Design a protein with these regions (language model features):
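FIC/Doc superfamily catalytic core
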Residues: 1-135
Length: 135
């Protein structure tokens, strides 16, 4: 069995939301701590109960759960994206968008508007993921 990944903490997600809110002048306010706690644990549940070791799937689970939790007053989608990337980076996987950053992120964010499925999100991560040092 593969060693357990490094998980993203609730505190790290709160800090990411604070940064995102500051960038846009939106309020940083955690309005549902319980929902955020559950969302942050979602990839662990996928790892343990579904025995899914695919990091694109784990990142997708985190992104979908945090965005869906709507635990913050603002910036939930941007925070979800950064947390998912943070999960990958904590496990020595980079998301290397190169010169395609704006277009690639626009495509991913179509999930939040119902124009990209969860499978599409996982495929997006698989397309742009690279193990650190091998990108």
């Amino acid at each position: 069995m593969a060693s357990e990944p490094r998980w993203v903490s609730v505190e790290a997600v709160v800090a990411l939301n604070r940064e995102e809110a500051e960038k846009t002048g939106e309020p940083h306010q955690l309005i549902d701590r319980a929902a955020l706690d559950i969302a942050v644990r979602r990839p662990w549940n996928v790892w343990v109960y579904f025995m899914d070791r695919d990091f694109a799937t784990l990142a997708t689970a985190l992104l979908v759960a945090i965005a869906g939790a709507k635990a913050f007053a603002a910036g939930n989608e941007r925070t979800a994206y950064r947390a998912a990337v943070g999960l990958l980076e904590a496990n020595e996987i980079t998301v290397d968008l190169g010169g395609n950053r704006e277009r690639a992120e626009e495509r991913l964010f179509e999930y939040f508007h119902g124009r990209l499925s969860q499978a599409g999100v996982a495929d997006w991560f698989k397309t742009w993921m690279a193990e650190a040092g091998r990108g």
